[in-house]
């Protein structure tokens, strides 16, 4: 919602939308950030107060960074944690580690794609390529296609999944096909 308001303010020049977006962002940062992670949703209790739930997902964390509501400067510890500790096979689970928060793992669309986008933004080309292989290689071996989910439980020939080609081209050549004006990555 925050990013939508910002985009509408930019595209249509509607006064007040940018300010409304900033209020939404401030509210989320103040009320949805609990114990070092963002909760997925806030609800009204019986008194009418808005309170956080106990729903924590890997995807919610990626949404906050992908849409720039939070960033690697405002939430450095969480940002580093999400790129380096979570999102790797079953590592979203606590693995018996009582210090590590249990997050519901991301599915392919949208969570995994946002994760890959964040790796690309950070110019982590080697890790990006490794994760593309880890996420997509088995799919291509089993069906010759890319899937909607992490498993073959739904569409096993999802057109949107071809978006992974952008990540692979970037990982191999340092070139972003969507933004060629940026030139080649430095690393």
Per-range role (PLM):
Residues 2-187:
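Active-site core of glycosidic bond-cleaving carbohydrate-active enzymes
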